[in-house]
A protein has these predicted regions:
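Inter-Walker segment of RecA-like/P-loop motor cores
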Residues: 90-138
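Residue-level preference for the first positions of well-ordered beta-strands
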Residues: 41-43, 67-69, 120-122, 154
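N-terminal pre-P-loop "Q-motif" helix
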Residues: 12-40
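SF2 helicase catalytic motif II
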Residues: 127-129, 145-186
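Conserved Walker A/P-loop ATP-binding site and its immediately adjacent core
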Residues: 54-58, 62-93, 129
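Short basic/glycine-enriched coil/helix segment immediately N-terminal to the Walker B
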Residues: 35-39, 116-119, 136-153
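Conserved adenine-nucleotide phosphate-binding loops and their immediately adjacent elements
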Residues: 2-15
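Walker A/P-loop
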Residues: 34-59
Length: 186
């Protein structure tokens, strides 16, 4: 259901057939995995110009995701994620938060706390920043503890190939796999 376009969004195009198919396959897979009590993980190996950003938002929309975390290995893609969300009519009311620059910039955790919890929130950050560890203590960076405390409806890894096989990424994924195995054994 659309509103009166109070945000003056200008884009109103539909998904292309290949995007619809990717979203449909992912939704079906997620449904089957959840029915079996597993956490779904799905990789889109799509060519450049496929429209993965727009299709990922459409997936989030169809999942009725209210809290979406986008982690990227390539922070330069932030503008594309922000523009797709903030200009398309389908995502009216959705909020985009990210690390901002400048002396007046609010920290991302403050932006999250100030966001309207009644509307979908997309939180964008770099994998290196959000999931990195404090070099002195080896623990979670204090400014990002909140990211790990939220039960995200959907987590998207963008530009996965730029860093997925680095030691920090492998260690994190191994830790997550062990935690999930422990939950399934319970």
């Amino acid at each position: 259901t659309r509103t009166a376009n109070m945000e003056n969004r200008t884009r109103d195009f539909a998904m292309r057939p290949e995007q619809k198919e990717a979203v449909k396959r992912t939704l079906n897979y997620f449904k089957a995995e959840r029915a079996d009590g597993r956490t779904p993980r799905f990789l889109w190996n799509a060519k450049m110009r496929f429209g993965k950003t727009f299709a990922a938002y459409q997936l989030a929309r169809r999942l009725n995701a209210r809290r979406v975390l986008i982690l990227t290995f390539k922070p330069a893609v932030q503008t594309a994620w922000k523009e797709d969300l903030e200009t398309h009519l389908d995502f009216e009311g959705w909020q985009f938060i990210c690390r901002e620059q400048g002396p007046e910039a609010l920290p991302i955790d403050a932006q999250y706390r100030q966001a309207d919890a009644g509307r979908p929130i997309v939180c964008f950050g770099s994998f290196q920043d959000f999931l990195g560890v404090n070099k002195e203590t080896g623990g979670i960076k204090p400014q990002h503890e909140w990211v790990r405390e939220i039960n995200w409806d959907l987590v998207i890894f963008d530009e996965y190939h730029f860093g997925a096989w680095k030691e920090n990424a492998k260690a994190l994924f191994l830790m997550e796999d062990e935690e999930e195995e422990g939950r399934q054994d319970s």
